[in-house]
Every structure is written in C-alpha cells, then in structure tokens.
C-alpha cells in the first residue's frame, strides 16, 4: 500500500537489524552526500599550536591512518567489546563500508567541499540562518 516505517541510524545498528532479519536497509546516505564535515573537531588556534594540541593532532592523525589502512576485520575484532549487541561479521561489514566511503581519510583537515556540504545539510534542515565563510571557520594546521 506504499506505506512503511522508516528510521535513520548509523552503522552498525541498521546492518545488525538486517542480519537479524527484522529490517532492510533502504538507502545509504553516505554515498549520496559525499564528503561532509559533519563529525568534526573544534579547538581554538592557540590550543592547536600548543604542545598538547600538537600531540593530540598527531595521535588523531595516526588513528585516522589506522582506520583507513587496517583490514576491517582487525578493527572489528579490536572494537567488538564496544559493540556488545553487534555480530562481529556485521561490524566488519560496516567498518569496511565506511572505509570504502572514505570516512577516515588520512588528511584530517576539513576540505572546503566537506564544509560546504555540511552547511547545505544544516541549511536544508533549517539549523542555520547564515553561511560562514570556510576561511573564517576552518583553521589550517601548519
């Protein structure tokens, strides 16, 4: 009859519902949206240039490289305790899909494309009334 019940969730929850036979993934938004700075870190330039800021950025960059280059099954095995209700094969599938979408690129700077896509989403949802310029918001680490 053209009606259904839909929810929006991030992985691995929808993949587990599908694996359990109680749901179906109708669409994945990530490939349609493309690069997006939705999950970003915020800090003041003074802190970023401090010893703590540089140490954090170095560790964060290593973590991103690890997520981008390590086999999904190895990551899933290490992260499994954080997802007690999720089957490890499902977690592996989800991590692999995120890797394929480029969710953890080695470059940690927010691209202008990703920033503008985020603003498009926020504007569509009427969460912002003004688009701040990329250069006014995004700080380039040197």
What are these regions (language model features)?
Residues 1-83:
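Pocket-lining segment of extracytoplasmic ligand-binding domains
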Residues 24, 129-130:
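Residue-level detector of short coil/turn "hinge" positions at structural boundaries
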Residues 26-28, 41-44, 87-90, 111, ...:
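Alpha-helix initiation/capping motif
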Residues 37, 44, 100, 106, ...:
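Glycine-rich, flexible loop/turn motifs
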Residues 49-128:
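Secondary-structure end/capping motifs
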Residues 131-142:
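Hinge/cleft segment of the Venus flytrap/periplasmic-binding protein
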């Amino acid at each position: 009859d053209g009606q259904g019940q839909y929810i929006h969730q991030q992985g691995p929850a929808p993949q587990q519902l599908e694996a359990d036979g109680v749901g179906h993934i109708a669409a994945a938004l990530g490939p349609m949206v493309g690069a997006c700075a939705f999950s970003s870190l915020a800090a003041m330039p003074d802190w970023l240039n401090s010893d703590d800021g540089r140490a954090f950025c170095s560790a964060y960059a290593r973590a991103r490289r690890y997520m981008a280059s390590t086999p999904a099954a190895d990551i899933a095995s290490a992260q499994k305790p954080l997802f007690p209700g999720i089957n490890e094969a499902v977690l592996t599938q989800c991590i692999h899909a995120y890797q394929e979408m480029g969710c953890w690129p080695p470059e940690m700077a927010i691209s202008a494309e990703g920033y503008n896509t985020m603003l498009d989403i926020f504007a569509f949802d009427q969460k912002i009334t003004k688009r701040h310029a990329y250069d006014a918001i995004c700080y380039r680490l040197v």
